[in-house]
Structure formats: C-alpha cells, structure tokens
C-alpha cells in the first residue's frame, strides 16, 4: 500500500495541467482606458551593465523598455539599438521610440496587429545574444546576455506577443 502512494506521488506531476510560465500583469490606463499587459521590470546584469527590461503591450503597440539602473545613460530620439541574434549574422537596427532623457530609459516598439510584424517575429524566432546601443555623441553601450538571460528575454517577448492579440479590437 505504501508503494502505491509513493508511485502515485511521483506520477502526479505528469497528470497535472502544465504551468504557464507567463506571469503577466494587466492594468488599465487611467487616461485612454485601454488595457495594457506587461511583464513588469525584470533585472538583468550583463558584462557589468545593470538594467531592467520590461515588455508591454497595448491594443496599438508592443513596447520593449530597457532601463539602465546603475549608470544613468542619456538617450534621445536619434539613439539606436542594434539587436544581435544567437548563431546568426542578421542584425536588427531600431530607433529609440522614447523621449529624450538622462535617466537610462530606452524604448523600441512594434505595431500590435493580427499579423506579427516581421522584425518582431525575428525576435520570437531567434534568441537575442546582445544589444549595442548608440546614444548621443556616439556613446556606445554593449550588453551581452548569458544563456539564462537569453532564454528569459525570449520567454518574456513570446508571452507578451501571444497575449497581445487578445487586446486587439474585433
């Protein structure tokens, strides 16, 4: 009898429903009354650079928000980010969609639509290996992600993009 309970205990996880690793936060914008989903800020430390990354979605856009928390960096409308992918020479170059600031906030966004934009789809198909951000006066910030961080960022993007489709007006 004891062996049956032990066997059942070890087999129980195989019959339990799969856990969703997406822990997204939902909020309503007080001004536009639009629903917004977000991963919240997840801390990353990569090659000495401390930053937090959040992926958010509204009915109109999907926003990647990089916030450099240790060394306050300045960014303006002309700042760019080069996203490098694992095992691939393809690079994604995007402009800062945020406003000018010296608080270390950098945004890049994609349109939220029924069909995922090709550049965003690339972020879902391949894992990001590093970022190269060029700020004012050609200042460059390099961020190289560890294997665990690559998987975390990929999971964050996949969860938000998947659930962002539910925000679209029918």
Which residues does each PLM region occupy?
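An ectodomain-focused feature that recognizes extracytoplasmic/extracellular
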Residues: 19-77
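Bacterial Sec-dependent N-terminal signal peptides
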Residues: 1-24
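Short, surface-exposed loop motifs enriched in S/T, G, D/E and P with embedded aromatic residues
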Residues: 20-35, 87-98, 142
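Internal interaction segment
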Residues: 88-170
């Amino acid at each position: 009898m004891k062996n049956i309970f032990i066997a059942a205990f070890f087999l129980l996880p195989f019959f339990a429903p799969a856990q969703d690793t997406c822990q997204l936060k939902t909020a309503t914008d007080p001004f536009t009354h639009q629903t917004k989903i977000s991963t919240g800020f997840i801390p990353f430390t990569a090659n000495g650079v401390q930053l937090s990354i959040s992926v958010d979605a509204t009915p109109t856009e999907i926003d990647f928000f990089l916030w450099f928390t240790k060394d306050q960096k300045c960014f303006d409308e002309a700042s760019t980010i080069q996203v490098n992918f694992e095992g691939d020479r393809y690079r994604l170059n995007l402009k800062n969609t945020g406003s000018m600031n010296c608080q270390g906030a950098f945004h890049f966004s994609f349109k939220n639509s029924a069909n995922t934009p090709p550049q965003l789809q690339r972020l879902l198909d391949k894992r990001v290996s590093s970022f190269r951000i060029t700020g004012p006066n050609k200042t460059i910030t390099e961020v190289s992600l560890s294997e665990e961080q690559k998987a975390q960022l990929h999971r964050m993007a996949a969860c938000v993009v998947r659930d962002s489709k539910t925000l679209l007006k029918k």
